Each structure stands twice: as structure tokens, then as C-alpha cells.
Amino acid sequence: MQASQFSAQVLDWYDKYGRKTLPWQIDKTPYKVWLSEVMLQQTQVATVIPYFERFMARFPTVTDLANAPLDEVLHLWTGLGYYARARNLHKAAQQVATLHGGKFPETFEEVAALPGVGRSTAGAILSLSLGKHFPILDGNVKRVLARCYAVSGWPGKKEVENKLWSLSEQVTPAVGVERFNQAMMDLGAMICTRSKPKCSLCPLQNGCIAAANNSWALYPGKKPKQTLPERTGYFLLLQHEDEVLLAQRPPSGLWGGLYCFPQFADEESLRQWLAQRQIAADNLTQLTAFRHTFSHFHLDIVPMWLPVSSFTGCMDEGNALWYNLAQPPSVGLAAPVERLLQQLRTGAPV
């Protein structure tokens, strides 16, 4: 399919069916679009909307975000996952405040230099908010292009990604780039979906190789399978009345900057920790274990609950706090921690 025909059909479809009333599309600014694009990485629109609205209510400008404590940013992000995005968001806001006087940059080089912003995200920010001519290549766009032009291979491979970038550059029109880029994302999200694509409703159906051959399932190529390693972590749920001991993780690494229960490799290490602090372990109870899967390994979590009668010996770590179940503080929590806290709120753990 010729590039001009491709873009014309996509734009015509967008004018009729595309999404035009998402929260970040109303009174668009580079800041709003940046925030939405970071949230939309690895996350669907329906999930992102309430998070976006909460962030905009609390941080209406990039300076507000830059001046906020990281704990508060992570707290508002809790549940959205991939927390490195939130840490990079905060770093980038501070960079904008420091280097650009609080005005979101408007050149590709400056936007792409922000933490957590790559080529596609930078292109999306500048094209969607300012109409600047930059192609994009997010997951939805990769899928549309790979199927239409039968580009084989996993897009994570550099040579495959380069082919898709070349196609994206070719089909992105000189005029209407803002509508076109939004249309491509909408097309991938609404029509050219991962499974059960609605080919009969697609504006590209007559020129799409995958549609003609009914081979959409082959494109884009899947990531080579790998067996994820398994690890075990013992979480200590130390509870005093309505409060539970949490400790902040180091700034980088797993759950960086988030609050978590004290974690141990095995039960013996956990009991040693208690003994060193002269905390009796007589009532230590194992709760139901569960699995939490990261992108690179499985973590089998074994919660160990222990009610204590006083705080003595529990607060020797400077990064620890007693988390009030009834009046929770504004701190970021790892998803399994939130799950266990909710379990404690509902009554006796099981």
C-alpha cells in the first residue's frame, strides 16, 4: 500500500471513529500529553484515566510535580505498576523546573533528554500537543505496521524495529500529523488488537497483507520464550494494634523508593531479625502464600504475621514507619504490600 493512501485512509477513519475526548486531549499541553504518554506505557487507557485525573488535580503544572515529595508521587502511582516510570516522571519534572524554568521543552532533543522519554514518546508529546512533525512507534503502531506490511520478527530486535521506524516515517503525512499519530494509536487499541482484530472494520483492510492472508496472528513476531526464575521472599507483617511496620526500599532496584514489609530470604533469617531485637516470636503465624510475577522473575511471597504489644526494638531502621491501617499515610506501596494491608484491614489474617 502506498504511503499516501495509507495515511489518507487512516485520517478518514479517525475523523469518523477516533478518540477525541480523552482527558489529556482536552486543552492539550505538552505537560498533559507527557504525563499521559508515560502512564500509557504498558498500561491500557481505561486504567490510566483515573490516575491521570488524580495527578492533574494534585499536580496541575510540571512545577507542582517537581516540588512534590517523591513519596507522594509514588503514593498516587500505587497500583499502576512499573514504578520506575513514576520515579523518572518526578526526575524529569525536576529537570524541567531546573533547566527550563518550569516550561515544558518544545524541541525533540530537549524532550528526548528527559528521564524515561525515548524517541517514540518524545515524538508523541510534540506531535500530539504542538502538531510538530515526528513519527511514533508505540506498541499499537508496531502492530498495525507489522500486519499491514507483513514485517516478520520480534520488534524488540533492532533490525525489526528499524524496519518499522522506516515504515512509520514513510506513512506519517506532512499535514495532519497530530490526528494521524492519535489515529494510529487508536487503530491499534480499538481495531488492530492483539487477539481477535476487527479486520472488517479496518480502513486498511484492502491493502493489509496480514488481512489478505488471514495471517494476523503471525505479526508482530512474539518475543522468544524464556523460563522465568523463581525466588522466595518472606514478608514480616509486624502489627501493633492498627499499625504495621513498613520500611522504605532503596531508591533504585526492585520497588525502588516504595514502602514494603521487612523481607527475608527464609524463615530462619526472619526469626534471627526478631531475636536480635528481643521480639518474641511465639505468636508468629504464616499466612497464605502467593506469587507475584515481575518481568524477569517470579517472587513467591510468604507472609508471616506477628502481633506485638509495643514498638520497642522495632524502629532501629531510619527508613521505617508505622503504617496506620485506619489513616494511611501518603506513601508509595508495592502492589503485594497493598494487597496484604487490605487483608489486615478486613480483620484477622488467614
Curated annotation (Swiss-Prot):
<keyword id="KW-0378">Hydrolase</keyword>
<feature type="binding site">
    <location>
        <position position="199"/>
    </location>
    <ligand>
        <name>[4Fe-4S] cluster</name>
    </ligand>
</feature>
<dbReference type="InterPro" id="IPR023170">
    <property type="entry name" value="HhH_base_excis_C"/>
</dbReference>
<feature type="binding site">
    <location>
        <position position="208"/>
    </location>
    <ligand>
        <name>[4Fe-4S] cluster</name>
    </ligand>
</feature>
<dbReference type="InterPro" id="IPR000445">
    <property type="entry name" value="HhH_motif"/>
</dbReference>
<keyword id="KW-0326">Glycosidase</keyword>
<dbReference type="GO" id="GO:0035485">
    <property type="term" value="F:adenine/guanine mispair binding"/>
</dbReference>
<keyword id="KW-0411">Iron-sulfur</keyword>
<keyword id="KW-0004">4Fe-4S</keyword>
<comment type="subunit">
    <text>Monomer.</text>
</comment>
<feature type="binding site">
    <location>
        <position position="202"/>
    </location>
    <ligand>
        <name>[4Fe-4S] cluster</name>
    </ligand>
</feature>
<dbReference type="Pfam" id="PF14815">
    <property type="entry name" value="NUDIX_4"/>
</dbReference>
<keyword id="KW-0227">DNA damage</keyword>
<dbReference type="InterPro" id="IPR003265">
    <property type="entry name" value="HhH-GPD_domain"/>
</dbReference>
<dbReference type="InterPro" id="IPR004036">
    <property type="entry name" value="Endonuclease-III-like_CS2"/>
</dbReference>
<comment type="similarity">
    <text>Belongs to the Nth/MutY family.</text>
</comment>
<keyword id="KW-0234">DNA repair</keyword>
<dbReference type="InterPro" id="IPR003651">
    <property type="entry name" value="Endonuclease3_FeS-loop_motif"/>
</dbReference>
<dbReference type="GO" id="GO:0034039">
    <property type="term" value="F:8-oxo-7,8-dihydroguanine DNA N-glycosylase activity"/>
</dbReference>
<dbReference type="GO" id="GO:0006298">
    <property type="term" value="P:mismatch repair"/>
</dbReference>
<dbReference type="GO" id="GO:0006284">
    <property type="term" value="P:base-excision repair"/>
</dbReference>
<keyword id="KW-0479">Metal-binding</keyword>
<feature type="active site" description="Proton donor/acceptor">
    <location>
        <position position="37"/>
    </location>
</feature>
<keyword id="KW-0408">Iron</keyword>
<dbReference type="GO" id="GO:0032357">
    <property type="term" value="F:oxidized purine DNA binding"/>
</dbReference>
<dbReference type="GO" id="GO:0051539">
    <property type="term" value="F:4 iron, 4 sulfur cluster binding"/>
</dbReference>
<dbReference type="InterPro" id="IPR015797">
    <property type="entry name" value="NUDIX_hydrolase-like_dom_sf"/>
</dbReference>
<dbReference type="InterPro" id="IPR029119">
    <property type="entry name" value="MutY_C"/>
</dbReference>
<dbReference type="InterPro" id="IPR044298">
    <property type="entry name" value="MIG/MutY"/>
</dbReference>
<dbReference type="Pfam" id="PF00730">
    <property type="entry name" value="HhH-GPD"/>
</dbReference>
<dbReference type="InterPro" id="IPR011257">
    <property type="entry name" value="DNA_glycosylase"/>
</dbReference>
<dbReference type="InterPro" id="IPR004035">
    <property type="entry name" value="Endouclease-III_FeS-bd_BS"/>
</dbReference>
<feature type="site" description="Transition state stabilizer">
    <location>
        <position position="138"/>
    </location>
</feature>
<feature type="binding site">
    <location>
        <position position="192"/>
    </location>
    <ligand>
        <name>[4Fe-4S] cluster</name>
    </ligand>
</feature>
<dbReference type="InterPro" id="IPR005760">
    <property type="entry name" value="A/G_AdeGlyc_MutY"/>
</dbReference>
<dbReference type="GO" id="GO:0000701">
    <property type="term" value="F:purine-specific mismatch base pair DNA N-glycosylase activity"/>
</dbReference>
<comment type="function">
    <text>Adenine glycosylase active on G-A mispairs. MutY also corrects error-prone DNA synthesis past GO lesions which are due to the oxidatively damaged form of guanine: 7,8-dihydro-8-oxoguanine (8-oxo-dGTP).</text>
</comment>
<dbReference type="Pfam" id="PF00633">
    <property type="entry name" value="HHH"/>
</dbReference>
<dbReference type="GO" id="GO:0046872">
    <property type="term" value="F:metal ion binding"/>
</dbReference>
<dbReference type="Pfam" id="PF10576">
    <property type="entry name" value="EndIII_4Fe-2S"/>
</dbReference>
<protein>
    <recommendedName>
        <fullName>Adenine DNA glycosylase</fullName>
        <ecNumber>3.2.2.31</ecNumber>
    </recommendedName>
</protein>
